[in-house]
Amino acid sequence: MKKRICGLLLGILCTVAFTGCGLEEKTELENTGPQKVELVVWGAEEDTELMNQIIEGFQTNYQGEADFHISFEVQGESQCKDVLLGGLEDGADVFTFADDQLSALAAAGAVEPIGNADEIERKNLSSTVEAATINNQLYAYPLTADNGYFLYYNKQYITEEQVKTLDGILEAAAANGKLFTMDWSSAWYVYSFFGNTGLQVGLNDDGITNYCTWNQADGEIRGVDVAQAMLRIAGNPGFASCTDEEFLSGVKDGSVIAGVSGVWNSVAVREAWGKNAGAAKLPTYSCNDRQIQMASFSGCKLIGVNAYSEHPEWGARLAEWITNEENQRLRFEMRGQGPSNIAVADSEEIKQSEAIAALLEQSEYSQLQRVGGKFWDPVSKFAGNMAAGNPSGQNLQEQLDEMAEGISAR
């Protein structure tokens, strides 16, 4: 009898204990709620309004699935790699960058292959997919197909005939007391003068160092010929070497009537010049008694997901959201940037864009930007001397040799 009573009491106690545990577990689950997801997004300052709108749409779309805390921070796309690799764990979860930085980011383990690569590849232009791919694996999400440059010009001052040659553009600028501008402090733009001359620069098989023949002293076009052509341009009263920001300021205040830039400035140029806003491929320039078509670097912008993010799955969802068809269309409407998404690229709105049309025309004379890190500073130094009129009087061949040596340094 005592055994039966003890057994009964033990059963009651166990039931109460298990019931209490169940209630406690249920309460904990109810109090947990959606997971808190904090994400930081990096992008260009000009993208602030656009990206905040895109982020807001993302949070609305996934409302209830997580407790989102997503913020946008300004970080220049051209310096993204260096800043991110300076502290991966402290860097943005999602970031915008130029495609030439992908190899270094992947090598450092900052980005990893994308899971749904087939779907992303199917929706985007092949050239942008190629730019986002390493060893047949997609590492980033294509965002734009317009990371190149062309000519903006004011039709009020420059005719369709003059816009074909740099001589014609400079003549029109000087005659009207205005300026044609180009950023010679940037090696990205300076490539224009060398790219279609037969002089070579590029990446060696090691993927790090460069080869360079820009100092070549023989052939139809020598390095000295290009240097002399640049000095003649620099000495023209209708020319000024200006940064992209200075170009835009000049467009707005009326001092600049032509300049080399990209689609990121198309909206601002159109607002400033109105119906007189024109866009065309880069002109030819005079070099060694002939006209040389100015070349350009081309590429695209990509969205990456930090491999060290605390929420990589949500980071990937956000990256895909930023680059989807709807938001690439919005990007074109708000920023005038050319889409990588095939459906948007084929739309009538894109076909009617004079800036995009100019970029496509220039693409025939463009080259994917594939150079190592030691390309930039030597070219900027050389071009800076040319822009200033070679004030030291140093021999041009010596300067070209120094530049080529710096570019190809190991």
Functional labels for PLM-detected ranges:
Residues 33-46, 66-73, 94, 139, ...:
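Short, well-ordered beta-strand elements
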Residues 63-125, 156, 250, 257-258:
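Extracytoplasmic "Venus flytrap"/periplasmic binding protein-like
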Residues 85-86, 90-93, 121-153, 178-182, ...:
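A structural signal for short loop-to-beta-strand junctions that line the ligand-binding cleft
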Residues 99-149, 161, 167, 279-282:
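Hinge/lid segment of periplasmic solute-binding proteins
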Residues 139-143, 149, 170-215, 256:
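Extracytoplasmic/periplasmic solute-binding protein
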Residues 358-410:
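Conserved C-terminal helix/tail region of periplasmic/extracytoplasmic solute-binding proteins
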